[in-house]
UniProtKB/Swiss-Prot annotation:
Protein name: Cell division protein FtsZ
Similarity field: Belongs to the FtsZ family.
Chain segments carrying region Disordered: 432-452
Cited NCBIfam families: ftsZ
Species whose genome carries this gene: Rickettsia conorii (strain ATCC VR-613 / Malish 7)
Database matches in SUPFAM superfamilies: Tubulin C-terminal domain-like (SSF55307), Tubulin nucleotide-binding domain-like (SSF52490)
Subunit comment: Homodimer. Polymerizes to form a dynamic ring structure in a strictly GTP-dependent manner. Interacts directly with several other division proteins.
Pfam family, one: Tubulin
Chief localization: cytoplasm
Protein location: Cytoplasm
Function: Essential cell division protein that forms a contractile ring structure (Z ring) at the future cell division site. The regulation of the ring assembly controls the timing and the location of cell division. One of the functions of the FtsZ ring is to recruit other cell division proteins to the septum to produce a new cell wall between the dividing cells. Binds GTP and shows GTPase activity.
Record-level Gene Ontology MF annotations: GTP binding; GTPase activity
Amino acid sequence: MVLNIKAPENIVLKPTITVFGVGGAGSNAVNNMISANLQGANFVVANTDAQSLEHSLCTNKIQLGVSTTRGLGAGASPEVGALAAQESESEIRNYLENSNMVFITAGMGGGTGTGSAPVIARIAKELGILTVGVVTKPFHFEGGHRMKTADKGLIELQQFVDTLIVIPNQNLFRIANEQTTFADAFKMADDVLHAGVRGVTDLMIMPGLINLDFADIKAVMSEMGKAMMGTGEASGEDRAIKAAESAISNPLLDHSSMCGARGVLINITGGSDMTLFEVDNAANRIREEVDNLDANIIFGSTFNPELKGMIRVSVVATGIDADKVPTYKPAIAETTNIVPEETYNKAIAQPTQIEEMPDFNSYSTENIEITDSPINQNFIGNEKELGLHANTFNKSEDDSPKPSFLGKIWGSLRASNNQTLERKNVVVSTLDQDNKESDIHDIPAFLRKKRD
């Protein structure tokens, strides 16, 4: 007997983090992260503009909507951007399916980023991937139309992502000066994404005293709502406190306050000279900013030899305004002329009434009395129009007109429904014996037959 002994393959079990850049702004953000040599994440870029895609530093590229846009861009139309992403859905799904966490970065207000980012986020949600959106909003000088387009895109995106981080470009003026170049200003905005991704990856790949696993990170990042993300570095005296205060006061974010946060992720990184008291001071300074006593605060600390003499504090506060997040509801086929359920149930509860057609030949020519039927009470309001006022048949011949022909027929119908016929002084039609000599043609045909 031959035994085949084979050494087990080395299986690496670690979470896969993907940074997905969408449109021109998203592609530029990915380029800056690749240039900064960020470790621990995979990069993918997707664009409708073939020329912009060609100049990307990323090797994983998706040409969105080849048939829809033919590589010419979305023309600032979110609808075209969405159609392009839907056309390339299978390719997007292939790049996402092995990821545990994805950062989707885009610029809101244009066509590709505004329209495609929600589609990509929806695919990630369907795959069960922890999804974080990091997007920018237009400058004020770009006009109200572009800002409204961005706001609509944010509403659409927010229902698919677990956490949303918004960076208004207008906030760049808070940190820029007259010498700041346009490219440097946008790089500052991209650094927010860079710091956030690095803060997550460092917790999982860097050695440290307090390491966090992916389940810890997912518990915080899946709180829904908007998020605040910041990083601060400091050296010298009180470096831990200074780094923490810098992290929690990011001037670029739409929500720079941690008030109302449901989850907080703290990462404190330093060199071998970082002390226990410094870690405690930094963590407590951040905790003071959280007003929610039930907030889920997860803390980690790692070592980085390159940070000797410095301390870096990264914080992510999630679940801000979580109660205002729109709920994603899968689309259903539209139908028309549907009766509301309440109305339908009431109709079913009512008994069906079938009225028989009366036999006009069976009516007697003698005097009859017509009594009201409960079934016909709802028609009383229309009796005046038909010459059937309630007092018409009770008045004497001297003070009231004779019932009209229509009144006679209507009264006969009411009598048939109630099946109650009583004698009274209402004359339908009689032939007086004294008028036998009247012209025979003055008598209705059906009465002539009865007479004969």
